[in-house]
């Protein structure tokens, strides 16, 4: 177990014993989202852990459903280990909403996750994938399978902001920015190289950063603002000159569909990204770069000659990418 794994386990255990998260309100309001957080043990590979988790989840969720007066629910899951709970809640339909290839995640038992997912697919009535790679994988089954890419709140990210975020005060321009979780999927080494090759550019990371070369090297032109509330993202992006998506090229990132890609596009700013499959499908809007040399060239082009930027998506594109449209498609797929 690495130090990072240890801290993750401690965080998981602390959440487990937050008993307030397991309660259900006595009088929930109509259309309210109710969160039920059952006690779950980590380390599913250990003998008996899956049985214990199944018992606690089943008891907690059944209690919540009864309290809310819900019978024959539609069960929607995004994780393979839900295979252990199918059939326990009297569900009328099971939907596997696949958002990642979890078998490729570092630290997870690959074969165990694959087996869980195979079992979940077998028990599901509908399969929904958020990327083309995941759709191709799920389509090998005989179950009805649908592609549903992420949506975007275009009005929110296209809004006019008078000033930049206060956390950017004192950070020199030009600025290349990234927001969101910077973890194993992100290329720490690449960004560290870019910071060293381009000392005149400030690289700003807004969000939680998992341990990696980028945080260890303490480079003078790399700035970590920490996380900010979602409502403050437009003000943060307003102070950046170019937006970046530096991903590691791997089996894991082959399957992801970055939520922030369309959010970045909605801002109208230039974007430089690693050439992962879902980004390649929008290459007319994004500068693609793989090596540090290609990244530096693309960033220089965006910063020095912004008038030569990529074309911007039109109204027809955005009309089909709203969360309202995606929600309707989801309901159509589920009820088909």
Please name every model-derived segment.
Residues 186, 231-236, 243-266, 272-284:
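Nucleotide-sugar-dependent
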């Amino acid at each position: 177990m690495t130090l990072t794994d240890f801290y993750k386990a401690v965080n998981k255990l602390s959440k487990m014993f937050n008993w307030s998260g397991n309660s259900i309100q006595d009088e929930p309001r109509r259309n309210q989202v109710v969160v039920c957080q059952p006690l779950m043990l980590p380390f599913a590979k250990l003998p008996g852990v899956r049985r214990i988790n199944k018992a606690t989840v089943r008891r907690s969720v059944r209690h919540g459903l009864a309290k809310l007066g819900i019978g024959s629910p539609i069960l929607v899951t995004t994780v393979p280990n839900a295979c252990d709970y199918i059939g326990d809640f009297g569900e009328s339909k099971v939907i596997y909403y696949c958002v990642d290839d979890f078998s490729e995640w570092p630290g997870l038992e690959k074969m165990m996750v694959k087996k869980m997912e195979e079992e979940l697919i077998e028990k599901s009535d509908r399969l929904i994938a958020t990327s083309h790679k995941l759709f191709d994988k799920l389509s090998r089954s005989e179950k009805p399978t649908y592609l549903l890419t992420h949506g975007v709140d275009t009005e929110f990210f296209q809004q006019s902001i008078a000033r930049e975020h206060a956390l950017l005060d004192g950070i020199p321009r030009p600025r290349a920015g990234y927001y969101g979780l910077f973890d194993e999927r992100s290329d720490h080494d690449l960004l560290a190289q870019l910071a060293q090759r381009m000392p005149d550019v400030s690289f700003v990371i807004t969000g939680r950063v998992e341990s990696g070369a980028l945080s260890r090297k303490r480079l003078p032109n790399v700035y970590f603002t920490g996380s900010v509330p979602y409502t403050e993202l437009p003000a943060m992006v307003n102070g950046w000159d170019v937006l970046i998506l530096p991903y590691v090229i791997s089996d894991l990132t082959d399957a992801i569909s970055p939520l922030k890609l369309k959010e970045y596009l909605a801002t109208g700013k230039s974007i430089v990204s690693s050439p992962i499959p879902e980004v390649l499908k929008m290459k007319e809007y994004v500068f693609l770069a793989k090596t540090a040399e290609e990244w530096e060239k693309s960033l220089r082009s965006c910063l020095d000659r912004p008038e030569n930027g990529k074309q911007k998506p039109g109204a027809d594109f955005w009309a089909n990418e709203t969360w309202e449209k995606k929600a309707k498609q989801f309901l159509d797929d589920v009820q088909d």
